[in-house]
Each structure stands twice: as structure tokens, then as C-alpha cells.
Amino acid sequence: MSIFTEAQAKAILDKVIALSKADECTAVLAGSISGNIRFALNNVSTSGIVDNTELAVTVAFGKRVGTASINEFDDAALERVVRRAEDLARLAPENPEFMPAIGKQSYRASPTFSESTAAIDPAFRAKVAADSIAPCRGHGLIAAGFLEDGQGFQATANSNGNFAYQRTTNFDYTCTVRTEDGRGSGWVGRNLKDAADFKADQDIRIAMRKATESQEAKALEPGKYTVILEPAAAAGLISFMMNFFSARSADEGRSFLSKKGGGNKLGEQVYDPRVTMIADPWHPDAPVLPWDNEGMPRERMAIIENGRIANLDYSRFWAQKQGKTAKATPGNLLMSGGDKSTAELVRGTQKGILVTRTWYIRMVDPQTVLLTGLTRDGTFYIENGQIKHPVKNFRFNESPVIMLNNIEELGKPVRVAGDESSYVMMIPPMKLRDFTFTSLSDAV
């Protein structure tokens, strides 16, 4: 399949809407062409291109809803998918929380498409792999990494006259570097809007340095430490916390934002006053589609403002039930910070621990967002503003809510992607006090 133009996408969606005999019909057409290259043990192992386009049709008879999808787009296929969705809707029980399709909306385009990223070809990917592998091989180090890039489009339409179309690109690179004896490990990751900003031959040096310097790690006693979390390390915890910003879960007593006696903490001070987080689909470095999965127009809005809960995620059903205004679910998380780099935060630290990355983060207690996870790929002891020596990795038990009340200093936000999050994020490196490490890990 090719990337459909706006006119081509609209023609398909118009046919689908016209074919439907249901009370209402919503159709989403999305496609992408993505390329990738994978390398391990200093050799390219796989590369390829994935081309996929899919149409999802949702119809309703009263409060009975059915959805079907297909990846063929001739007239017969379009009729088949519509009839299948209608058959499923007739068989479905009524949805007590059914909400009708949204009305016609107006969307302001966001800059989610980059020409340089869309122009990436196999030669570009091969050069990224070569620029990652060659310096490692020359220094007796072992590189393993993955680059994935792509371009795509999304279009949505419904029987109320709503229509939207926008093109997108994506670029994501990660590389882990190990010493030959496996005792040292370093990592670097880049999630970018514009591939022109990527320099593999420079970024690989970060992972190489950390791999070399993380050998001969010393054991520190578990306990509470001042830490500097690099943006990738902080992003995993913060993105996990944002899953609990549902107004419904807070109102029903299932969230750290639930209020004793009922209700939620909207408007209350929950974090350090330096914590501000917004969603903005038009952010130049971290743009997202200007609509959410229901077609609701996204807007620039504060989620946390000076430590106060400024907005919660109200679904259309819950907003109607509670007498609130529904807003689109955010697609990005943009946290404010200062101007310092991670290195500058290190230079201003008397004693502490630098954490490159956190991983395998899991929930311990949803009422406090207590999380557990591990550090990896470069954990270092800081003394008198300098990296003194590597330390063995830790298991941590920490709540990002407590973490964001123990801020010493915030650095300059950078774009990162969480390992298990769909958010596009701008997160600063952060210096925190009393971060809780509970045990040691022998992994590197």
C-alpha cells in the first residue's frame, strides 16, 4: 500500500459512511511505511520495511456497538467490513456507557510530518548501523541496537459530517554497548521528530563511555540517596504515573488523586511548586495529532501547574455523569525545567548517584503510585561534582509522586520516549533527594 493522500482517504471514508445502514458510523483509516535495521555483536542482523494500512469501522444501532477492520479497499471489501460491523452490533448487548459519535469538529494541523525523516532510505539506515558499530569494534566494545523510522497518515470520519486527515513521521534509535567481558554496559537513545538532528557517530560515544566507565562497579548499601535521573530514567516513572490521571478512577477512590470522603484532588497542591506539565499538540519538538482516539480536538492545556492538579482526564461518559466538560486525552507530556544539562547537575552535586536508565518498572501500590524497578546501563557514584566510580545496579521502590516532592533541581527538558508508554515526552534531568534503593542487582 502507499501513503494515501487526503483526497484518497476521504473518498474511501465517504464510501464507508454511505454504505452504513446503522444509526451512526465512524471510520478510521490509518497507514504507515516503516523501515528498520537491527545490529548485534557488532554486525547487522536484520533489516526490513513494514507496509501496512488498515480501516476500522464502528457502527451503532441504539446503544449496541460493533467494530470490524480490514486491509482491503475495493468496493466489495468496503461493503464487507461495514456489514460485518453491523452484524456484530446487532449481536452485542447494549452498552450502558454508550456515547454517540462526536459532531463535526475543527482541527488545527500540528507539525507531525518531517520531510527529512520521510526521506530515510536503506542507505541511511546502513550508515547509522556502521557509525554505531565501527567505533565500538575499534575500541574492543560490542554494540547492539535498533533503528526504526517511518511515515504514515491517519484519517477519521463519521456520519455526523466530521473528517480529519494528517500525515506523520517517526524516528527512534537505541543502542546498548557492552565491554567484551560483559562487566560494563552503556546505553543511548534518541526519539526525534527530525532525522536531520541525529548524529549516530556522536551519540554512540555516550554509550561507549558509559560502558567503559561502568566496569569494576562497587557495591553501595541500599538506602535513600540523592540521585540525578537522566531524562530517560525519569520518563519511565513519570509516564507510569500519568496513567492514573483519570477523573473516574479518582472519583471512585481508585487513585492517588482520590480525595478522602469522595471526589478528587483537582486544583489541589500535590507536587513541588516547580513541577509544571502541559500537553500541547503543536509543540515544535514533540508534536502529536490534534485529535484523540474519539476524534475530540486536542488543545494546549496544563495538566500540573506549579505543583497543583490543573486537569484530569474526563471521558465523555464520565464528564456527562459528573456535569463536567470533556476534553481530549493528551498525546504528549511536556515537563518544564531549567537550563542545565545532566553534566552540569552532576558538577553541582556533593554526593549522589547518577542513573542512566530505569527499566522493568511495575506497580506495587496504585493508591500511592509506589513503583518498583531496576537501574541499568551505567549507574555512578558522584562525589564533589565528579563521577567517582561506577556502582552496582539497584532495585528501587519509589513513588513518582514522592519523587516530585523531593526535587533539588531540574535541568533542561529533552525529547524522550518511555519504554512502555505511548506518550511523546519532553522530560528534564532531575536531581532528587531521598530516592529509595531497596536492594542490589548483579545485572549490568
Cite the ranges covered by each PLM segment.
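Dual-mode signal for accessory low-complexity, basic/Gly-rich regions
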Residues: 262-444
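Active-site bordering "gate/hinge" segments
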Residues: 1-289, 296, 305-308, 331, ...
